[in-house]
Regions:
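Extended amphipathic alpha-helical segments with heptad-repeat/coiled-coil character used for oligomerization
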Residues: 305, 309, 313, 320, ...
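Long, highly charged low-complexity segments enriched in Glu/Asp and Lys/Arg with interspersed Ser/Thr
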Residues: 380, 385-417
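Extended, helix-rich architectural segments
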Residues: 1-100, 411-412, 417, 423-424
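Active/binding-pocket-proximal capping segment
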Residues: 275, 289-296, 321, 328-348, ...
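Extended, charged amphipathic alpha-helical segments
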Residues: 152-302, 345, 356
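Glycine- and charge-rich intrinsically disordered segments
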Residues: 201-208, 215, 219, 406-424
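Active-site-proximal structural scaffolding
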Residues: 60, 189, 193, 264, ...
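Extended, regular secondary-structure scaffolds
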Residues: 56, 60-61, 66-185
């Protein structure tokens, strides 16, 4: 049977959103002992939590996420933005293709000329250590680079063609999804399972086509079951009638075809198993467990060993890239005279696993760890269980100390007086 693909389950999109949720569904904490205020300002000014989620999606379906830093007149903090990896072209060392020396961001822009004809231009930003170079070229109709054009064609005022940044590294930070040793580009989460995605959608479309066909099946039977429509002249069968059948006449009936749908459903199960293997997911990751019980936190982590392992790999890349992004932003601001910029930024990122918290299980663990031989301070327990800023944690510790002080006050005892008694 030949079926047209009219049904798509978008399993790739579900994979990307799953790992983005595990990475940034719970926002990580950025901790700096000496520059916490600057770090918080930088995060708030750039909406970094939302930007990180977009970057995680891009990392999954493009193979890498790309951050770019720049300064904007009138803004105190540097601007960090996520740009499409489709416009990123690395400049690599000829002797080591994985070592990136610079970055070219290039995209096509269009503009109508005086004759109403659309002219294409190639816009490029070339990021090298210590400098940024802005360029614009006119393209021919078949996309060949022609003469160089003035940046004022699109911008007023135009950006400087050559600009010193004061930073010894390019202001572009790349987060690969999975690195390989023969390419500067990362591998996405889809390429290993492309054929399985196609087969899943195709089988579901075939089943849907069969079911649609059998909602209005063809009939067969004797001529006596037909009557002529006076409006159209066609011979039709009226539903809901009784047809008497002569001794030698075939009874009316429906044409039924055994589509072997059970085989299709079994094949879909095998496809899903292959998808789970290729994408490091499973039914539990998509809340498709057949049992009605809800696993606890520890049990859920055991069920999600493979998804969490891939998430940890992604987290390794993001941890390095984000700490580098913060460091470059501080250097850029300091080199261009921004205020309240830290010197050598020491940043630590506290990541979460993205799984729903089990408060009782977490509290029991913390109780064990903080009682007897304490392996965790009360401050750390409050931060992990309740979150909050350092100020709110200090306030909570002060309340705890006050409660303990009240509980340790000396007890007041009343002296018993004997009334009506006289001394001997």
């Amino acid at each position: 049977m030949r079926a047209t693909l009219e049904l798509a389950i978008n399993f790739p999109g579900a994979v990307s959103k799953l790992f983005s949720d595990l990475l940034f569904g719970e926002t990580p904490r950025y901790v700096s002992i000496d520059a916490q205020e600057w770090v918080d300002d930088f995060i708030a000014a750039n909406g970094l939590h939302r930007a990180n989620y977009r970057a995680a999606l891009a990392q999954s379906y493009r193979g890498e996420a790309v951050y770019k830093l720049r300064l904007v007149e009138g803004r105190e903090r540097a601007v960090a933005e996520v740009i499409p990896a489709s416009i990123w072209f690395p400049v690599t060392d000829p002797d080591n293709v994985t070592e990136i020396l610079g970055h070219v961001l290039a995209w096509v822009k269009t503009k109508e000329n005086g004759d109403g004809k659309v002219v294409k231009y190639l816009r490029a930003e070339i990021h090298l250590p210590g400098s940024i170079h802005q360029r614009l070229w006119r393209l021919s109709e078949d996309g060949i680079i022609q003469e160089r054009a003035d940046l004022g064609t699109f911008y007023s005022p135009p950006p400087p063609e050559d600009q010193e940044t004061g930073v010894e590294e390019p202001l572009v930070v790349v987060v690969p999804n999975l690195e390989v040793d023969d390419s500067p580009f990362g591998l996405d989460d889809y390429s290993e399972a492309d054929t399985l995605f196609h087969q899943l959608d195709l089988r579901l479309a075939q089943i849907a086509k069969v079911l649609d066909r059998h909602t209005d099946p063809n009939m067969y039977g004797p001529v006596s079951a037909l009557e002529q429509d006076p409006a159209t002249g066609e011979w039709v069968v009226r539903a809901g009638r009784y047809f008497p059948v002569a001794e030698n006449e075939p009874p009316p009936g429906y044409l039924v075809w055994d589509a072997k749908l059970e085989a299709n459903f079994r094949f879909i199960e095998h496809i899903m198993q292959g998808l789970y293997i290729a994408t490091d997911t499973n039914a539990a990751a998509f809340s498709l467990l057949e049992s009605g019980s809800v696993p606890s936190g520890a049990a859920l982590k055991r069920l999600l060993i493979r998804p969490l392992a891939r998430t940890n790999r992604k987290r390794l890349y993001f941890d390095v890239a984000l700490r580098r992004l913060f460091a470059l932003a501080a250097q850029l601001e300091r080199a261009n005279g921004r205020r309240d910029v830290p010197g050598d930024l020491d940043l630590h990122i506290e990541w979460k696993d993205g799984l729903p918290e089990d408060p009782r299980e977490a509290a029991e663990i913390e109780q064990i760890r903080t009682g007897g031989k304490a392996t965790s301070s009360v401050r750390s327990a409050i931060r992990r269980l309740d979150g909050g800023s350092e100020e709110s944690i200090e306030a909570e510790l002060a309340e705890i100390a006050a409660d303990e002080a009240r509980g340790e006050m000396p007890a007041v005892t009343l002296t018993t007086f004997g009334f009506g008694q006289t001394e001997e």
